[in-house]
């Protein structure tokens, strides 16, 4: 399909990104990725076709927008002395690192970081441009992002807040790379804010997390893209010996989104946990490919994902637990549950275990069901409306995942977004 090819010359590509101050090696990567994008396939999905999503209908003139006026960070719940990064459109407009952390962590916009050699240890190490058409286009048009390097033996309990604001119609190809040093501990919260209800520009978000020996990172994410948009979100992790990555994902979008959440549990004794909560509305299509790949001895990988469907939405949970040959003593578990509040909604769950080793523990479970009319009737008999009753049951259904989110601010925001979506979309 012609709409799935970037109509972009090398000359135009160079012109678009002439003001990023990026090194020549990355410009060459853009060119290679552009060539690859013409021949690489889309990821193969069950029940959905990315080829039909028109993901690459990009207005190239909006890839590098100028921000006008000051950004009032207080509007987004950020104080000037908070440990925080604020990005507006494609530009980081605020970075504050408290003095006590100044020599413990490096935080830079992605293009500034490219000019430091140590970024090459982690940037593009987990997500390769030649992986698929989606990744090739992402690296071709990468226009914003953040690089974080937490030094060895550093423990930072206070979470870094990363607020990404879009107040204009723009395609954002955002890239976050986080490298956590040996025996370090780090907490990260990202919140994508877009109140442009008529924004139709496609988006591509990629996060790479590398946890070195003994490191721990809690990565919490809220996305809330508007309903006219379509896009892809890739979150990838790599764990070395005795390290831990906790992914806490609240996908509150109204946009059609393909999510790929994959962690390679490489080191012996390392662990990855993925928790996802989502709510589908209107005609929304959402696909989650969630994978944990146990490669190290006595490694552990868990997937827990809960979804609620309203209206005519369609959600797919594709879960894969893969224990490779030689990963003895490993443990892989996954649970996918979906609750439908509409007879027109469609829910699919595809749990898979791929086990190439004997001395392991593995399990999976999936459940799809309609909201319980008897429970609704009971609550309504106590004076609640049907909508209020539905909201209580939805919160109860999602609470096992929301309660596992490690940051109170994330829990509160997710709860508010769930209530808004039920009030705006659920039929009486």
Language-model region placement:
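Short amphipathic alpha-helical segments at helix boundaries and their inter-helical linkers
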Residues: 44-49, 62, 391, 396-413
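Short amphipathic alpha-helical segments with coiled-coil-like heptad repeat character
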Residues: 41-49, 156-157, 300, 387
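N-terminal amphipathic, basic helical "cap/leader" segment at the start of enzyme domains
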Residues: 1-139, 144, 310
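Conserved beta-strand/loop scaffold segments within soluble protein domains that form the structured core
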Residues: 103, 114-384, 398-428
């Amino acid at each position: 399909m012609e709409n799935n090819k970037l109509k972009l010359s090398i000359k135009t590509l160079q012109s678009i990104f002439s003001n990023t101050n990026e090194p020549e090696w990355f410009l060459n990567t853009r060119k290679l990725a552009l060539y690859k994008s013409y021949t690489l396939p889309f990821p193969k999905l069950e029940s959905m076709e990315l080829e039909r999503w028109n993901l690459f209908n990009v207005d190239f003139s909006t890839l590098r927008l100028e921000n006008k006026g000051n950004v009032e960070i207080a509007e987004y719940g950020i104080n000037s002395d908070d440990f925080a990064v604020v990005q507006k459109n494609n530009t980081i407009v605020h970075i504050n690192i408290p003095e006590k952390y100044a020599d413990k962590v490096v935080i830079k916009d992605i293009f500034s970081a490219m000019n430091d050699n140590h970024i090459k240890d982690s940037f593009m190490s987990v997500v390769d441009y030649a992986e698929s058409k989606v990744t090739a286009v992402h690296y071709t048009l990468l226009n914003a992002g953040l690089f974080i390097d937490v030094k060895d033996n550093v423990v930072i309990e206070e979470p870094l807040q990363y607020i990404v604001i879009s107040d204009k119609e723009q395609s954002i190809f955002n890239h976050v790379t986080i490298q956590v040093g040996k025996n370090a501990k780090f907490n990260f919260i990202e919140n994508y804010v877009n109140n442009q209800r008529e924004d139709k520009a496609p988006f591509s978000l990629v996060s790479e997390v590398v946890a070195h020996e003994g490191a721990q990172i809690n990565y919490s994410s809220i996305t809330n893209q508007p309903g006219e948009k379509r896009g892809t979100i890739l979150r990838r992790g790599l764990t070395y010996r005795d390290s831990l990555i906790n992914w806490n994902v609240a996908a509150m979008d109204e946009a059609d989104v393909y999510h790929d959440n994959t962690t390679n549990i490489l080191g012996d004794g390392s662990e990855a946990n993925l928790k996802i909560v989502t709510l589908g509305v209107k005609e929304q299509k959402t696909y989650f490919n969630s994978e944990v790949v146990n490669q190290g001895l006595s490694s552990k990988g868990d997937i827990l994902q809960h979804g609620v469907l309203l209206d005519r939405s369609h959600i797919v949970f594709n879960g894969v637990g893969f224990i490779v040959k030689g990963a003895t003593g490993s443990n892989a578990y996954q649970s996918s549950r979906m609750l439908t509040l509409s007879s027109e909604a469609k829910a699919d769950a595809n749990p898979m275990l791929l086990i190439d080793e004997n001395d392991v523990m593995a399990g999976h479970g999936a459940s799809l069901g309609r909201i319980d009319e008897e429970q609704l009737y009971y609550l309504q008999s106590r004076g609640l409306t049907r909508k209020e009753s539905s909201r209580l049951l939805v919160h109860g259904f999602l609470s096992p995942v929301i309660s596992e989110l490690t940051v109170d601010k994330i829990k509160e925001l997710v709860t508010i977004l769930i209530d808004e979506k039920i009030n705006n979309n659920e039929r009486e």
